[in-house]
Regions:
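Non-catalytic signal-transmission and effector/linker regions of two-component phosphorelay proteins
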Residues: 1-14, 78-79, 83-84, 101-102, ...
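Acidic, metal-coordinating helix/loop segments flanking the phosphotransfer/catalytic sites
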Residues: 14, 27, 39-57, 62-65, ...
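Conserved acidic carboxylate
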Residues: 17
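Acidic phosphotransfer microenvironment of two-component signaling modules
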Residues: 20, 41-45, 119
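The feature encodes the CheY-like receiver
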Residues: 23, 65-67, 96
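Charged docking surfaces used in two-component/phosphorelay signaling
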Residues: 24-32
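Short amphipathic alpha-helix used as the core "switch/output" element in two-component signaling
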Residues: 48, 69-84
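Hydrophobic/aromatic residues positioned on beta-strands within the core alpha/beta folds
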Residues: 91-92
């Protein structure tokens, strides 16, 4: 049924974003490109979802409510699901912040700066996670 025989369902992507408008846009873009999106507004909830579910990739805002930010989500993934750490994309409107810059240097994870062009965002996602379909 699939070309490669390795995919039977759309790639599940965990989306961590607390701004409703950005969440809606990113979710719509990912879904229109064939990804199955599981959204959450907080880093703490993201960790609960990661503990109980498998994901093909993660798109995470750097700053999230719930006491757990994007850097902490990445650290958990790197420790517990290292294969997933290579498929995480950060999004942030605070790229000039030194803490954000240090996290990006330390992790090597790609980051798309908000506001972003949809084409630029999905290009980074597909380069990082592969195409969904």
């Amino acid at each position: 049924m699939t070309q490669t025989g390795t995919k039977s369902a759309p790639a599940r992507v965990l989306l961590i974003e607390d701004e409703p408008a950005v969440m809606a846009l990113v979710r719509a873009v990912l879904e229109s490109h064939g990804y199955n999106v599981v959204p959450t507004e907080s880093g703490a909830e993201a960790l609960r979802l990661l503990e109980k579910n498998d994901f093909h990739g993660v798109v995470s805002d750097m700053r999230t409510p719930g006491g757990v930010d994007g850097a902490q989500v990445y650290a958990w993934i790197a420790q517990h699901r290292p294969e997933l750490a290579r498929r995480l994309v950060f999004i942030t409107g605070d790229i000039a912040n030194e803490e954000t810059a240090a996290t990006l240097r330390r992790t090597g994870a790609p980051c798309v700066e908000k506001p972003f062009r949809v084409h630029d965002f999905i290009t980074v996602v597909e380069q990082t996670m592969g195409r969904a379909a």
